[in-house]
């Protein structure tokens, strides 16, 4: 019987996730290194996240403990102060984190106007879309089906506003991916930088 978990030939081995949280801006003050999920940052001895250094990622952080509230996606790199990781500038609170699994070279996502995958839809394959309106899709986004890859949806065009992590699976309504209202106006891939592919965009009604 064939295994579903056979490794793909030539597939890069993911690095162990590693993120360092500093209490002060610009990587100063008390710090704590994480290599796995952290449901409550304060339990590590870090009172407040002032800056973040991602050495191997990606990660998703949350405004509240136990992975609740506003979401913040962290990819490998430096985040010297809170407004470098929030695209909404609504809160400077970062209370829990977990690594994001990126296990697919291909990326395919379908966004639907209505809950339960109905109404007008837009399909995106191996591409980032900074503005749905510019591509002729002006409807709300009430449900999402991620066929492959890991994505970040944004409330506004240009990757601004609230962020929504979209991992492989079905989201029957906007609450399933943490959106207070069915508004997603841009989307991008989270990529393992060892993979690069040219994108293709397929609007459909």
Swiss-Prot record:
Renumbered to this chain, region (C-terminal arm) spans 193-205
Please name the gene that encodes this protein.
CRYBB2
Known glycosylation sites: 11, 48, 68, 76, 101, 108, 120-121, 140, 168, 172
The segment(s) forming the Beta/gamma crystallin 'Greek key' domain are 17-56, 57-101, 107-148, 149-191
Q: Which UniProt keywords apply?
A: Acetylation, Eye lens protein, Glycation, Glycoprotein, Repeat
Q: Does the keyword Membrane apply?
A: no
Q: Which GO biological process categories is it annotated with? A: lens development in camera-type eye; visual perception
Q: Which residues carry this modification: N-acetylalanine?
A: 2
Instruction: List the InterPro entries hit by this protein, alphabetically.
Output: Beta/Gamma-Crystallin (IPR050252), Beta/gamma_crystallin (IPR001064), G_crystallin-like (IPR011024)
**To which protein family does this belong?**
Belongs to the beta/gamma-crystallin family.
Question: Do you know which SUPFAM superfamilies this protein is assigned to?
Answer: gamma-Crystallin-like (SSF49695)
- Site (Not glycated) at 18, 42
Q: How does it assemble?
A: Homo/heterodimer, or complexes of higher-order. The structure of beta-crystallin oligomers seems to be stabilized through interactions between the N-terminal arms.
Designated name of the protein: Beta-crystallin B2
Q: Name one GO molecular function term.
A: structural constituent of eye lens
């Amino acid at each position: 019987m064939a295994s579903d978990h056979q490794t793909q030939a030539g597939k890069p081995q993911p690095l162990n996730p590693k993120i360092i949280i500093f209490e002060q801006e610009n990587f100063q003050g008390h710090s704590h290194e994480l290599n796995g999920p952290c449901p409550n940052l304060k339990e590590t001895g870090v009172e407040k996240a002032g800056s973040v250094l991602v050495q191997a990622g990606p990660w998703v952080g949350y405004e509240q403990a136990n992975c609740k509230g506003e979401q913040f996606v962290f990819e490998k790199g430096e985040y010297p102060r809170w407004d470098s990781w929030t695209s909404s500038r609504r809160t400077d609170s970062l209370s829990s984190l977990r690594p994001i699994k990126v296990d697919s070279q291909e990326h395919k996502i379908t966004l639907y106007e209505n809950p339960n995958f109905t109404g007008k839809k837009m399909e995106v394959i191996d591409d980032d879309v900074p503005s749905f309106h510019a591509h002729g899709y002006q409807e709300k986004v009430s449900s999402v089906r991620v066929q492959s890859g890991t994505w970040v949806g944004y409330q506004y065009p240009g990757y601004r506003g609230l962020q929504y992590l979209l991992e492989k699976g079905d989201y029957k309504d906007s609450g399933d991916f943490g959106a207070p209202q069915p508004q997603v106006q841009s989307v991008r891939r989270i990529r393992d930088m060892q993979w690069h592919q040219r994108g293709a965009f397929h609007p459909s009604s």
